[in-house]
From Swiss-Prot:
One of its GO terms (biological process) is transposition. InterPro entries: Integrase_cat-core, RNaseH-like_sf, Transposase_IS3/IS150/IS904. SUPFAM superfamilies: Ribonuclease H-like. Belongs to the transposase IS3/IS150/IS904 family. Pfam families: rve_2. It comes from the Bacteria. Keywords: DNA recombination, DNA-binding, Transposable element, Transposition. This is Uncharacterized transposase-like protein HI_0493. GO terms for molecular function: DNA binding. It comes from Haemophilus influenzae (strain ATCC 51907 / DSM 11121 / KW20 / Rd).
């Protein structure tokens, strides 16, 4: 990826239903950019034809790193690695709402640090 990488929208979904997860993804209009890219791992959900079709309908390009190769999209892999380390590993959540609150708190902190650094 060339140019600046930024997170245009951050969403969460408490289910592993491909259609519901795909519907939580931002649209091109939401992102206010010409060429939005969604970065994900190679999980089964992201490889499903229905999920990929919904992304195409919304003009969102899907980007997946090759298995075991974090260098394909170092910026996003680094972000997700940090996110998991700081708010997921070694923690227990009773509800999805608690996990979502933790994710949003780290997202806000990361965004503030990024803007201060620019």
């Amino acid at each position: 990826m060339r140019g600046r990488t930024r997170i245009g929208k951050f969403t969460t979904c408490g289910e592993r239903n491909p259609k519901k997860v795909a519907r939580t993804q931002p649209t091109k209009k939401d992102l206010k950019t010409q060429n939005p890219i969604l970065h994900s791992d190679q999980g089964w959900l992201y490889q499903m034809v229905g999920y990929q079709a919904i992304l195409r309908e919304n003009s969102i390009q899907q980007n997946m790193s090759r298995k075991g190769n974090y260098l394909d999209n170092n910026a996003m892999e680094n972000f997700f690695g940090r996110l998991k380390t700081e708010c997921y590993y070694d923690k227990r959540f009773e509800t999805f709402k608690q996990l979502k609150k933790q994710l949003m708190s780290i997202f806000i902190i990361t965004t503030m640090i990024t803007f201060r650094g620019n």
